[in-house]
Amino acid sequence: XSSLPAASVSLPADSEGGEEEDLQCVCLKTTSGIHPRHISSLEVIGAGLHCPSPQLIATLKTGRKICLDQQNPLYKKIIKRLLKN
């Protein structure tokens, strides 16, 4: 059994008359070359009005936050497992 990093899933709340700046994807660039052992926590932001696809944000053990490419098979598996919970 592989040990997955701590994770949280946040589904966007539909904002009532929220500001237009909020209606965008957090992840404009993604990366797929990060090994899970370098990740201290993961956050999945579900798709919504602000962004058409789910976003996977990893916090590295160095404290840096990066967006992971959810098309990567390894990350897809992680997202699927997280969204099940």
Swiss-Prot record:
<keyword id="KW-0145">Chemotaxis</keyword>
<dbReference type="InterPro" id="IPR039809">
    <property type="entry name" value="Chemokine_b/g/d"/>
</dbReference>
<keyword id="KW-0964">Secreted</keyword>
<dbReference type="GO" id="GO:0008201">
    <property type="term" value="F:heparin binding"/>
</dbReference>
<dbReference type="GO" id="GO:0030168">
    <property type="term" value="P:platelet activation"/>
</dbReference>
<feature type="modified residue" description="Phosphoserine">
    <location>
        <position position="41"/>
    </location>
</feature>
<dbReference type="GO" id="GO:0019221">
    <property type="term" value="P:cytokine-mediated signaling pathway"/>
</dbReference>
<dbReference type="GO" id="GO:0008009">
    <property type="term" value="F:chemokine activity"/>
</dbReference>
<keyword id="KW-0358">Heparin-binding</keyword>
<dbReference type="GO" id="GO:0005615">
    <property type="term" value="C:extracellular space"/>
</dbReference>
<dbReference type="InterPro" id="IPR018048">
    <property type="entry name" value="Chemokine_CXC_CS"/>
</dbReference>
<feature type="disulfide bond">
    <location>
        <begin position="25"/>
        <end position="51"/>
    </location>
</feature>
<dbReference type="GO" id="GO:0016525">
    <property type="term" value="P:negative regulation of angiogenesis"/>
</dbReference>
<keyword id="KW-1015">Disulfide bond</keyword>
<dbReference type="InterPro" id="IPR001089">
    <property type="entry name" value="Chemokine_CXC"/>
</dbReference>
<dbReference type="GO" id="GO:0006955">
    <property type="term" value="P:immune response"/>
</dbReference>
<feature type="binding site">
    <location>
        <begin position="76"/>
        <end position="82"/>
    </location>
    <ligand>
        <name>heparin</name>
    </ligand>
</feature>
<keyword id="KW-0597">Phosphoprotein</keyword>
<protein>
    <recommendedName>
        <fullName>Platelet factor 4</fullName>
    </recommendedName>
</protein>
<dbReference type="InterPro" id="IPR001811">
    <property type="entry name" value="Chemokine_IL8-like_dom"/>
</dbReference>
<dbReference type="Pfam" id="PF00048">
    <property type="entry name" value="IL8"/>
</dbReference>
<comment type="function">
    <text>Chemokine released during platelet aggregation that plays a role in different biological processes including hematopoiesis, cell proliferation, differentiation, and activation. Acts via different functional receptors including CCR1, CXCR3A or CXCR3B. Upon interaction with CXCR3A receptor, induces activated T-lymphocytes migration mediated via downstream Ras/extracellular signal-regulated kinase (ERK) signaling. Neutralizes the anticoagulant effect of heparin by binding more strongly to heparin than to the chondroitin-4-sulfate chains of the carrier molecule.</text>
</comment>
<dbReference type="InterPro" id="IPR033899">
    <property type="entry name" value="CXC_Chemokine_domain"/>
</dbReference>
<dbReference type="GO" id="GO:0007189">
    <property type="term" value="P:adenylate cyclase-activating G protein-coupled receptor signaling pathway"/>
</dbReference>
<comment type="subunit">
    <text>Homotetramer. Interacts with TNFAIP6 (via Link domain). Interacts with CCR1. Interacts with CXCR3. Interacts with THBD; this interaction enhances generation of activated protein C.</text>
</comment>
<dbReference type="GO" id="GO:0030595">
    <property type="term" value="P:leukocyte chemotaxis"/>
</dbReference>
<dbReference type="GO" id="GO:0045944">
    <property type="term" value="P:positive regulation of transcription by RNA polymerase II"/>
</dbReference>
<dbReference type="GO" id="GO:0006952">
    <property type="term" value="P:defense response"/>
</dbReference>
<keyword id="KW-0202">Cytokine</keyword>
<dbReference type="GO" id="GO:0048248">
    <property type="term" value="F:CXCR3 chemokine receptor binding"/>
</dbReference>
<dbReference type="InterPro" id="IPR036048">
    <property type="entry name" value="Interleukin_8-like_sf"/>
</dbReference>
<comment type="similarity">
    <text>Belongs to the intercrine alpha (chemokine CxC) family.</text>
</comment>
<dbReference type="GO" id="GO:0045653">
    <property type="term" value="P:negative regulation of megakaryocyte differentiation"/>
</dbReference>
<dbReference type="GO" id="GO:0042127">
    <property type="term" value="P:regulation of cell population proliferation"/>
</dbReference>
<feature type="disulfide bond">
    <location>
        <begin position="27"/>
        <end position="67"/>
    </location>
</feature>
